[in-house]
Amino acid sequence: MRRAGILLDVRSVAHGGQPGDLRRACIAWVNTLAGSGLSLWQILPLNPVDGVGSPYASRAANAIDPSLHPELAGDITVTASEVTAALESQPWLRRFAVFEALREVHGAPWTVWPLAIRNAGLNLDVTVDETRLRHHAAVQVALGRAWQAVQAAAAEAQVLIVGDMPLYVAEDSVDVWSAPHLFELDERGRAQQRAGVPPDIFSDTGQLWGNPVYAWAAHVEEGFAWWHQRVARLAELVDVVRLDHFIGIVRAWSIPGDAPDARTGEWIDVPGASLLSALDDIDVAFIAEDLGLVTPAVKQLRNERHLLGMAIHQFGFGGDAYAPHTPSLTPEDVVAYPGTHDNDTVLGWWTDADETTQQRAVTAGVEPSAPVRSLLQMGLACPARWYIAPLQDVLGLGAEARMNVPSTVGPHNWSWRANDDHMSREAIAWFGEVAKAHGRR
């Protein structure tokens, strides 16, 4: 089915700020989408954000961001028996609650905790304050119930929630602390090998992300149980999972832990086919974020698994090498975007584009007098099975509304928030009307 929808982080949804207001705003939002003839809501990861607001270097792969609790679930009462039942039935929740309780007492990162506590994660062989533990568990139970209400509204409105799974987790995370043998660590728990990407035309030194690289042999030995639990948990929260950095489950750029940048890394093979096969029994669809250095092996795995890939139309005017990202040449088996959270808004991109890029775009059909709407119209008309645009682009906002500038840190990232006017503007209705005209819903 040809579908269309909007990318909007849950944290960016406009709401009143009172307990439960964000939950009610999310429910209203899915009804707005459905009422506009749209059927996709893509979100950024729901996991806890890091110290600079990014959800892509989380301290917990299975938890919902506790900072969302007051506005999303602050009006929900959780009983002691519910907390006990959740702790007994969900092993990830006990690990997370113990980890959070220890962080409150000992601070972060866990790699500098006292030795006995540092080494206690695998079997949770540690004593923690029960009140703290149960508090963190109760917050997760409340968040889970709140999100279930949003999911129920989306299901009734026939809107699919498209989630996002970062490939890696943070070094200072419950995941690494509780399963250190699954990561390439030294004796103190610090990453011996770190993730990133090699130098390219955009960066002479590559990108050093800092996340610990997986000890893939250990994952194979355990039948990918850690991954199965992680994806099964995410499948409880969303209908579709975007596999971030899909090329990294075929081969990964592994950088020495003490390297100052990514230049000294090396490629390591990753058992991606076996990993995906281990997830076959989980009822969730995947989107492969196959951007970057796409090798024949990456293409082969995506095709074998019949996964939708991705196309970014802002990239489509850079010459022949970027032809698959050109709207009219976009393949059918992809999800197309004008840009994602890592790109500038369309208006910001157009404003900064050089003359050659603008001319190529105009030749392809972009109208200089209306670059945003014309590119969105081209996207909605393109062959891609699904088309998703950030809300900022549907609204025609400029670079000030950009969500993230990769490889930078600062208040300009992860801070954009919609207001009430944004959430109900006629632009959303226009987007839905054009989608319908091109056979999408």
Language model regions located:
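Outer-envelope exported proteins of Gram-negative bacteria
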Residues: L44, L160-V162, P166, V240, ...
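Conserved, well-ordered alpha-helix/loop/beta-strand core segments that scaffold catalytic motifs
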Residues: A137-V169
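Surface-exposed amphipathic alpha-helices with a cationic face
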Residues: A34, W147-A157, D280, R302-N303
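Short alpha-helical segments and helix-capping/turn motifs at coil-helix boundaries
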Residues: R24-N31, R145-A153, H228-Q229, P371-L375
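Terminal-tail/helix-coil boundary detector
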Residues: W416, D421-R441
